[in-house]
Amino acid sequence: MKATGIVRRIDDLGRVVIPKEIRRTLRIREGDPLEIFVDRDGEVILKKYSPISELGDFAKEYADALYDSLGHSVLICDRDVYIAVSGSSKKDYLNKSISEMLERTMDQRSSVLESDAKSVQLVNGIDEDMNSYTVGPIVANGDPIGAVVIFSKDQTMGEVEHKAVETAAGFLARQMEQ
């Protein structure tokens, strides 16, 4: 029998403590939802739950529609990674970790318009030269579950793009609440 992982006991309330190192590595924060699966071999599997990933195809279509109408690149992310990309290279963004700047914007629950950005991190650890960007957090039932990002490397954005990102975030939030 191979021994991998860490052994933990279940307390009298049925709780299991997930070690801090694992939580940090997987970016599991206090209050984050986890899915519990049981496979055929009797193994219990914990998976980080992303409510917005249920909207994966829908988010992709919405990103495509925004790109078609505005002509700027569009990204949609959950709390950890980008789940939809339109107008930019998918290999540069899709399933890549979001930056700390994006996490902070989601935690503040308010949209941002930066019209004279220089160097910005959208993907964790990768600086990009940008002219402007706007971010709208997707807040469902009071909790930030993702964000919509519209950015341009050569054009300046204004209130139209800012309102579009807020509208998209609000619409996706309402879809999640239903």
Curated annotation (Swiss-Prot):
NCBIfam families: lp_hng_hel_AbrB, spore_V_T. Residues 56-178 are annotated as: GAF-like. One of its GO terms (molecular function) is identical protein binding. Keywords: Activator, DNA-binding, Repressor, Sporulation, Transcription, Transcription regulation. The keyword Signal does not apply. Residues 5-51 form the SpoVT-AbrB domain. To B.subtilis AbrB and Abh. It holds the Pfam family MazE_antitoxin. Homotetramer. Two monomers dimerize via their N-terminal swapped-hairpin domains. These dimers further associate into tetramers through helical interactions between their C-terminal GAF-like domains. Transcriptional factor that positively regulates or negatively the expression of a large number of forespore-specific sigma G-dependent genes. May provide a mechanism of feedback control that is important for forespore development. SpoVT levels during spore formation have a major impact on the germination and the resistance of the resultant spores. The keyword Transcription regulation applies. It comes from the Bacteria. Gene3D superfamilies: 2.10.260.10, 3.30.450.40. Disruption phenotype: Deletion of the gene leads to aberrantly formed spores. Mutant spores release their dipicolinic acid (DPA) via germinant receptor (GR)-dependent germination more rapidly than wild-type spores. Spores are also more sensitive to UV radiation and outgrow slowly. Coiled coil: none annotated. This is Stage V sporulation protein T. GO terms for biological process: sporulation resulting in formation of a cellular spore. The N-terminal domain binds DNA non-specifically and the C-terminal GAF-like domain is crucial to its correct folding and function. The non-specific DNA-binding activity of the N-terminal domain is modulated by the C-terminal domain, which perhaps in combination with another unknown factor, confers activity and specificity. Induction: Expression is regulated by the sporulation transcription factor sigma G.
